[in-house]
Amino acid sequence: MAIEFRSVTKRFADGTIAVDDFSLVLPTHKTTVFVGSSGCGKTTLLRMINRLIEPTSGEITIDDEPIQDRDPVQLRRGIGYVLQNAGLLPHFTVLDNVATVPVLSGVSKKQARARALELLDIVGLDRALADRYPRQLSGGQQQRVGVARGLAADPDILLMDEPFGAVDPIVRKELQTETIRLQRDLDKTVVFVTHDIDEAFLLGDQVVILEKGARIAQVGSPSEIMENPATDFVAEFVGVDRGSRALSLKKTPHGTVLVDAAGRTQGVLTGNGPEAGL
């Protein structure tokens, strides 16, 4: 399902313009990553897709249908949503957390729980965790449950709002690799928000670098942005001048590899997006 922003502006009650005349098409069955520093408007963009935030002006469409014409509750039930810190219901078991949205959508509890068990397998969690509560899980396990819940209604669109920002670097790498695998297997339209350009390049087919007010500094594939940063701001943001953390592209027989200055592989780019993990 293609998502399109058409001249969208969001002005909050205090006068802050979070999004200023934003227009962009987010291609279907691809991962689009909004990346930028805190306060640039990336999360506001994401939350307007499922109408948690309403635009002040402009229009957002899904497959050319304005989302403002749809019931917001029904819209949200058809869009997966994964948050930082998972946002799990503390008094529900893992199984019931995952099964919640399908049950609310009219699926029988038995069917929803059966599907929830399948999703635990898909996101790499042992079924033995199904009867545990969120407080009994590690941070990484909670995030995997959050991803499973986001996929529970088999949505065409999955929104991911800095989902790995609160876990340690090792777990974060594992979750990033798992996200690449899931997208390859499930073929969803994914919108991912992060402040980390390395994460954006690892996960994104289309990367959107944002400045304040959600103004687009550059949009393109990771390789396009790395090879041809549009402005000095983009060049600095993507790490061209970051010493040991600088990123570069390396051609190999297996494709184009994203490496840091120490030669460590950060991802594999094939075509316009990530096809393999770390």
Question: What residues fall within each predicted segment?
Answer:
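Helix-to-loop junction immediately C-terminal to a conserved catalytic motif
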Residues: 50
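Short coil-to-helix segment of the ABC ATPase nucleotide-binding domain corresponding to the Q-loop/switch region
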Residues: 92-99
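A short, proline-enriched helix->beta-strand linker immediately N-terminal to the Walker B motif
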Residues: 152-156
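ABC ATPase NBD coupling module
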Residues: 66-80, 104, 109-110
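Conserved ABC ATPase signature
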Residues: 133-137, 141-143
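Hydrophobic anchor residue at the start of the ABC signature
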Residues: 147
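Conserved ABC ATPase "signature" region
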Residues: 103, 110-128
